[in-house]
């Protein structure tokens, strides 16, 4: 099989036809002017009657049947349902005996990993930008250290061995103290 390029040098020709006052355009030429001449441009008019539908290799029988049913509902004569890797092998002229592979390794996996990486990079850069003035704080300017919450677990080394304030409060203890103060206030109001 040899695919011959069209007059624009492309191996595919878009299904577009356009009519202007002076000419008829087909393919890329018609597609390129659709925004300026939408009324006189025709596209998406193919009538497919029969189809071989491809599905991801990990689809089970009920998913394959649901896909076939969907095709039938739309009016297609579904000739066959085949796995996407099988379709690719056939397209390359390979005689497929069997297929195997990682069904969860594809473009989306790489996309997700890139998105996660870029989100982390952005968060880190933005975090540093938002807190730049705090990072410039000189350790010598700190008189006492009171840590609350997760910070209570930081090492004293950062502060050159400076003793932590004896009233170090964890999140739980902080909540208890806060509730006790609130409760104490309610009792005082009741005594009045």
UniProtKB/Swiss-Prot annotation:
Q: Which GO terms describe its biological process?
A: cell differentiation; spermatogenesis
Q: Where is it predominantly found?
A: cytoplasm
Which InterPro entries does the entry mention? ATPase_NBD, Hsp_70_fam
Localized where? Cytoplasm, Cytoskeleton, Spindle
What's a GO cellular component annotated to this UniProt protein? cytoplasm
Residues given in the record as ATP binding sites: 46, 150-153
List every position bearing N6,N6,N6-trimethyllysine: 186
Tell me how this protein assembles: Interacts with FKBP6. Interacts with ZNF541. Component of the CatSper complex. Interacts with RABL2/RABL2A; binds preferentially to GTP-bound RABL2. Interacts with SHCBP1L; this interaction may promote the recruitment of HSPA2 to the spindle. Interacts with MOV10L1.
This molecule's function is given as: Molecular chaperone implicated in a wide variety of cellular processes, including protection of the proteome from stress, folding and transport of newly synthesized polypeptides, activation of proteolysis of misfolded proteins and the formation and dissociation of protein complexes. Plays a pivotal role in the protein quality control system, ensuring the correct folding of proteins, the re-folding of misfolded proteins and controlling the targeting of proteins for subsequent degradation. This is achieved through cycles of ATP binding, ATP hydrolysis and ADP release, mediated by co-chaperones.
Instruction: Give the protein name, as stated in the record.
Output: Heat shock-related 70 kDa protein 2
Gene name in the database record:
HSPA2
